[in-house]
Every structure is written in C-alpha cells, then in structure tokens.
C-alpha cells in the first residue's frame, strides 16, 4: 500500500477514489496501470491492483514467489512506484501514516512453507485446515512480536498507523477475518491447499 501526493512538500491528495473502485475515477489509477506495465516488462508478475480505503491510497499485489526472489521483486516494485510517479510530476510514498484520520499503509506479507510441492501449512483434518507446523509458525510470530516489530515498524511514524479503528494490526493475536490482529489466516478454499498461508500485517 502506498499514497500518491501532488508533491513531496505536503500530503496533498491526488485523488478521492474508493476501495476497489471498478472504473478508473482518478489520475492515480493511470499511474498504477503504468507501474504494472513497467513491472511486467521487468518480469515481475502482478496479481491484483486496486484503490485502497484512504484518499489517494493504492495497492499493487505481486504474485508470490520464493523468499529471496520476492524480496528482490518487492524492492524493485517500490522503486518503480516512486520513479513512475516522479516521471509524471507527482510523489509516491510508502510512509505508514502520512495523514491523520484515515487508514495508513502497511506491507502485508503472505507466508507459507513448502517441502517440494507440498504446502506444510495445510492439514485437511484440522478444523482450521492448519498443520501443526503452521500453528507453531504463528505461535513463534506472536511470541517474538516485540522483537519482530523493531524490523517491521522501524519508524516513529509506523506507530501512528498502529491505532484502533483503521484496519491496523493492534493486537498480538491471530484471526481469520479480524484485520486488527497481527496475523491473519485467510479462509481455506477447497481445492486450493497450496494457497494455505498466513498474512503478517
């Protein structure tokens, strides 16, 4: 998630689009589209893109990949977003909470563990379809939350985002649908065992 602003001097919004607007209603959607084309030209696969909840807030979701390649793609993605915005005379920022009173931006990292072709997080016999490995993985994230947060929320501004009421992860807990937990487990869809994963918010 990121914001487009008219300049880098003040958080003056570029658009007033809404969450998942289907029709392009703003200048930001064209910038987002151009960014997607640039990423695809570099071999980075994009799964989804949409306007986010806050004014001038956008999201581009990359196709999952193995960890090191995903880290490289993420850095390239961030540079592409900022550079294409700059080329078009606007400013893009991944700052967690540039404006008071609206949702901030986070980097929600979807994670799973594979052994060969088998998703080690999936267990058909569990009510949540989560294996013991997945539950231990989640437990580890929750147990070491105060240590991990120093890496995932390294700026003072990061903590301005972590307040109740704005879909921010304010509870060291996990859930299926509650977006105020640190870890969210997307619902299992029959036939999609390989998609079993956790989302670190």
Predicted regions and their residues:
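Glycine-rich, acidic/polar active-site loops that bind/position phosphate-bearing ligands
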Residues: 1-201
């Amino acid at each position: 998630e990121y914001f487009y602003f008219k300049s880098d001097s003040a958080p003056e919004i570029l658009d007033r689009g809404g969450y998942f607007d289907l029709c392009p209603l703003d200048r930001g959607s064209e910038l987002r589209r151009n960014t997607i084309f640039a990423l695809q030209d570099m071999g980075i696969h994009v799964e989804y893109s949409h306007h986010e909840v806050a004014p001038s807030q956008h999201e581009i979701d990359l196709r999952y990949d193995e960890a090191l390649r995903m880290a490289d793609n993420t850095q390239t993605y961030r540079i592409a977003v900022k550079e294409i915005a700059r080329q078009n005379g606007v400013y893009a920022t991944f700052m967690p909470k540039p404006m008071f009173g609206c949702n901030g931006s986070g980097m929600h990292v979807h994670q799973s563990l594979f052994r060969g072709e088998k998703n080690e997080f999936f267990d058909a016999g569990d009510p949540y379809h989560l294996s013991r490995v997945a539950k231990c993985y989640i437990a580890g994230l929750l147990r070491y939350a105060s240590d991990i947060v120093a890496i995932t929320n390294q700026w003072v501004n990061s903590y301005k985002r972590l307040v109740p009421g704005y879909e921010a992860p304010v509870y060291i807990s996990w859930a299926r649908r509650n977006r105020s937990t640190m870890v969210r487990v997307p619902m299992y869809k029959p036939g999609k065992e390989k998609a079993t994963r956790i989302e670190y918010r």
